Amino acid sequence: DFKSYILGILFYRYISENITNYINRGEWDSGNSGFDYADLDDSVAEDAREEMVGVKGFFILPSQLFCNVCKRCDKDDNLNETLEKIFTAIEASAKGTDSEDDFKGLFADLDVNSNKLGATVVKRNEKLVKLLRGIQQMQLGNYQDNTIDAFGDAYEYLMSMYASSAGKSGGEY
C-alpha cells in the first residue's frame, strides 16, 4: 500500500528537477555556465522566492531539493521530519497565490510518520531511504530535453498499475 509514497516522492523529484532546470537554464543563458541551483546557499536562493512562485507556482530551497535530500538521506536520523517539513514548505510556498489550490494538501497522503512504514522511527527512515533511492535510480532523463515525457509516462504507468491491482479501471484511481 505504498502508492501514495511512491507517487508523492516521484512528484517531489519532478518538481525539484523542474525548478532546478528552470533556474539553471536562466543562469546559463545569462553566461553563468558553471551555475547549479542545487549548490546555492539557501539564504541566496531566498532572493528568488517571489519570482519563482510567480513563474512556477511554488518554491523549493536548494537544501530541500530531491537531489540534496538524497545525498544526505542515509545520514539523516530525522529523515521523516525533514521530508515532512519540506512537503509543508512546498505547499506553504503557494499559499495566497493562484496556485494555492493546486498545492494545498498535495502531500497529505504521504504520511512519513505512519506505522505502515515501520514500527519505529528508525524503521520508517530506513523505508524512506529505500523509497528515495529507488526513485533516484529511475532513469527519467531531463524532461526538457526529451519529446517523450518520461516522468509523465512513469506516473501514468504507476497509476494504472495501482488501479488495476485495486480492481479499478483507468480513470477510477
Can you name each region flagged by the protein language model?
Residues 1-173:
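Non-catalytic, mostly N-terminal accessory regions of nucleic-acid modification and defense proteins
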